[in-house]
């Protein structure tokens, strides 16, 4: 069970640390905390000026960084919902994916890439970018062939099914979606 007092204490501590250190990274961290308050706390917070300023800061930061590192990739992967679906979001997604390919030798590469792909597949499918979505699903399929990456197989099956469903093969799509749901339930989760 979540302890709201503990969570509030951590949030306050992180904000205090961020305010004490006036560095670009501390300002970015404060902006992320501000955005996450509305995602995990109060959705009405999205209308506040603090949320809008934080959203703008994160978007501007990601646009202004010329060379992304793991840190920028993770920020985009976690905060991609801040960008409206469309060319800008797709461009940032492709930038993150291409940048990650440069880190193939890094031991966390498969996890970072899976996280990025899963977080962006739904918007790609909803916006009709089926070719790019198919490429992302194929990459996930390749990544989940490794036994250490099995946790990513359920979202891969789900999005593969959703893609099949919307591109003209509803029977196969529903079959994959139901399979993903069954696996998820077997692991003790609700879908």
Enumerate the language-model features and the residues they cover.
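Residue-level detector of the short coil/turn that links helix A to helix B
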Residues: 128, 168, 187-188
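Amphipathic alpha-helical segments of tetratricopeptide repeats
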Residues: 14-19, 56-63, 97-105, 137-146, ...
């Amino acid at each position: 069970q979540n302890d709201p007092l503990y969570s509030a204490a951590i949030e306050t501590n992180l904000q205090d640390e961020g305010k004490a250190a006036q560095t670009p990274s501390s300002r970015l961290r404060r902006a992320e905390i501000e955005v996450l308050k509305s995602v995990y706390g109060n959705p009405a917070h999205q209308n506040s000026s603090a949320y809008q300023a934080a959203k703008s800061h994160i978007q501007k930061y990601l646009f202004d960084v010329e060379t992304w590192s793991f840190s920028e990739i993770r920020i985009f992967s976690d905060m991609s919902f801040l960008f409206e679906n469309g060319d800008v979001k797709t461009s940032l997604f492709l930038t993150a994916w291409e940048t990650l390919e440069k880190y193939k030798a890094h031991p966390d590469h498969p996890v970072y890439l899976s996280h990025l792909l899963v977080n962006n597949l739904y918007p790609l499918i909803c916006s009709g970018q089926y070719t790019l979505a198919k490429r992302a699903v194929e990459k996930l399929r390749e990544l989940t062939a490794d036994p250490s990456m099995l946790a990513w197989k359920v979202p891969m099956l789900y999005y593969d099914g959703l893609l099949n469903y919307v591109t003209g093969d509803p029977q196969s799509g529903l079959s994959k979606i139901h399979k993903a749901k069954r696996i998820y339930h077997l692991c003790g989760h609700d879908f």
